[in-house]
């Protein structure tokens, strides 16, 4: 389980472990009045934390077949001017990750106008830099069922906005190793974000569906 914006002080994540029955966890405390990350896992997983910061937790573990697996849990910076720093950090992590690599979290970044619903036309800033990062890292977007948008603001007038900020990307090697993966975007209920529920090892899919590979090219337009 990966939580963002926990706003917890150091060592306060222990309470989350107890409430959710996790064996172990790792946290990044808040800075000032915002931020904070928490990652918890079940007893059957041996997770090795390799890198942690206020925007990214990188871990290594073995999948159910015993193959090495890398996962990066992302919290994109809310400030557009500082978001590039997160992409640079992600690139540095790629240099030490296994080819079997998954990236998941709140990237705080749209890729196109299709990721946004609102009553006012607005420019999608930062999309090109994000696309180029995904292209250089050779990451493919993973299909998710459920809700199209994963975040909404609190306005009830024509300033109301819904966006798709939470998503998952993976290397081709990860996709080939987990052909029956499932991601589902949950409804937005008690927070301004909806959670992503994932299952990497579905053994008996209800139907065989082809994977829609969405490699992001340099020529993609916003």
What is each model feature region?
Residues 1-222:
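A shared catalytic/ligand-binding motif for oxyanion handling
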């Amino acid at each position: 389980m990966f939580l963002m914006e926990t706003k917890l002080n150091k060592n306060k994540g222990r309470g989350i472990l107890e409430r959710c029955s996790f064996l172990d966890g790792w946290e990044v405390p808040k800075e000032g009045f915002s931020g904070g990350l928490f990652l918890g896992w079940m007893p059957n997983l041996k997770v090795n934390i390799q890198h942690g910061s206020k925007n990214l937790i990188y871990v290594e573990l073995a999948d159910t077949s015993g193959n090495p697996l890398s996962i990066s849990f992302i919290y994109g910076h809310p400030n557009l001017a500082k978001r590039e720093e997160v992409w640079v950090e992600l690139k540095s992590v790629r240099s030490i990750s296994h080819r079997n690599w998954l990236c998941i979290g709140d990237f705080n970044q749209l890729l196109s106008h299709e990721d946004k619903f609102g009553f006012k036309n607005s420019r999608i800033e930062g999309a090109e830099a994000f696309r180029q990062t995904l292209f250089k890292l050779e990451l493919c977007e993973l299909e998710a069922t459920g809700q199209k948008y994963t975040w909404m603001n609190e306005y009830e007038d024509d300033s109301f906005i819904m966006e798709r900020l939470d998503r998952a990307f993976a290397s081709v090697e990860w996709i080939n190793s987990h052909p029956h993966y499932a991601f589902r975007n949950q409804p937005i209920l008690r927070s301004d974000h909806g959670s992503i529920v994932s299952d990497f090892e579905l053994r008996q899919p209800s139907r065989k569906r082809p994977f829609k590979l969405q490699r992001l090219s340099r020529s993609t337009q916003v």
